Swiss-Prot record:
Highest taxon of the lineage: Eukaryota
Subcellular location: Secreted, Extracellular space, Extracellular matrix
Pfam family, one: wnt
Stated name of the protein: Protein Wnt-11
Originating organism: Mus musculus
Covalent lipidation (O-palmitoleoyl serine), chain numbering: 215
Signal peptide positions (record): 1-24
Function text: Ligand for members of the frizzled family of seven transmembrane receptors. Probable developmental protein. May be a signaling molecule which affects the development of discrete regions of tissues. Is likely to signal over only few cell diameters.
Secreted recorded as keyword: yes
Record GO cellular component, one term: extracellular region
Length: 354
């Protein structure tokens, strides 16, 4: 007796959700770690959700790092939601960690972005924690070897990018290095995209300066190397998401490599995000493919971008509604030195997709 197609489809869907295909970003479930869990004893490591055994071991040997990694998980989720707030796929499924839907379980363009962002975020958060003195195992970054420029001097406390990259990669890449978890093609794709995220973070390191001098003359400036804000790194990765390359796992010499599907005469660039499977249009709700749909999503009637009602609503139309907004108004500056404002209320028209 042959199984019905619907039964087979349901079984395959359930299997995809429980085979550990997406172990690499299950650690983002640390965002749900309760504040009551102090994370000051090694036995706490086993209580953390979404970790593979190698990450549990890293937790035990670097216990002081775990509170920072919890902050990184929360930061990655927030940055993803902000970066894609104006898109059909709005990264809401990242909050289902560790039990993702197929938009992040499979080798999609969306999972490529999340792997890159999570790798960048954990390294960014650790590097900044070193600078702020929150981690006993690290301190400020090294003084650069190049000259600081005329009128400048190196000083301050640089973000410790090298330590952030080292510990971030150890933790976030650990699941992809576990044997018998997912296909080799998926592992290669996820490791590649994670490295793209770290590359974007390296590119965000810039010289920051503070002026010194009499009456603000800025006769000398103290400078240091600092990372851009995480949202700027996320914006860079979103640009790479929009131009991501579809790849296939193909033999080249004695081993298989990821090569562009349509341009397989050239290797994959180190700077580009790659994906193995095409995504749906995310117009209609369909959990089998990880789509939440865009019904009831807010859209912008006057925009020509991805948040426009035409694009966001997929041609289904939209419904208007009115909203009351309370804001500061009639502000006055008083000498010296404060501002007083009144509170004004106005009505605005908004639109949601049918």
């Amino acid at each position: 007796m042959r199984a019905r197609p619907q039964v087979c489809e349901a079984l395959l869907f359930a299997l995809a959700l429980h085979t550990g295909v997406c172990y690499g970003i299950k650690w983002l479930a640390l965002s749900k770690t309760p504040a009551a869990l102090a994370l000051n004893q090694t036995q706490h490591c086993k209580q953390l959700e979404g970790l593979v055994s190698a990450q549990v071991q890293l937790c035990r040997s670097n216990l002081e790092l775990m509170r920072t990694i919890v902050h990184a998980a929360r930061g990655a989720m927030k940055a993803c939601r902000r970066a894609f707030a104006d898109m059909r796929w709005n990264c809401s499924s990242i909050e289902l960690a560790p039990n993702y839907l197929l938009d992040l379980e499979r080798g999609t363009r969306e999972s490529a972005f999340v792997y890159a962002l999570s790798a960048a975020t954990i390294s960014h958060t650790i590097a900044r924690a070193c600078t702020s003195g929150d981690l006993p195992g690290c301190s400020c970054g090294p003084v650069p070897g190049e000259p600081p420029g005329p009128g400048n001097r190196w000083g301050g406390c640089a973000d410790n990018l090298s330590y952030g990259l080292l510990m971030g990669a150890k933790f976030s890449d650990a699941p992809m290095k576990v044997k018998k978890t997912g296909s080799q093609a998926n592992k290669l794709m996820r490791l590649h995209n994670s490295e793209v995220g770290r590359q974007a973070l390296r590119a965000s390191l810039e010289t920051k300066c503070k002026c010194h001098g009499v009456s603000g003359s800025c006769s000398i400036r103290t400078c240091w190397k600092g990372l851009q804000e995480l949202q700027d790194v996320a914006a860079d990765l979103k640009t790479r998401y929009l131009s991501a390359t579809k790849v296939v796992h193909r033999p080249m010499g004695t081993r298989k490599h990821l090569v562009p599907k349509d341009l397989d005469i050239r290797p994959v660039k180190d700077s580009e995000l790659v994906y193995l499977q095409s995504s749906p249009d995310f117009c209609m709700k369909n959990e089998k493919v990880g789509s939440h749909g865009t019904q009831d999503r807010q859209c912008n009637k006057t925009s020509n971008g991805s948040d426009s009602c035409d694009l966001m609503c997929c041609g289904r139309g939209y419904n208007p509604y009115t909203d009351r907004v309370v804001e500061r108004c009639h502000c006055k500056y008083h000498w010296c030195c404060y501002v007083t404002c009144r509170r004004c209320e106005r009505t605005v028209e908004r639109y949601v997709c049918k």
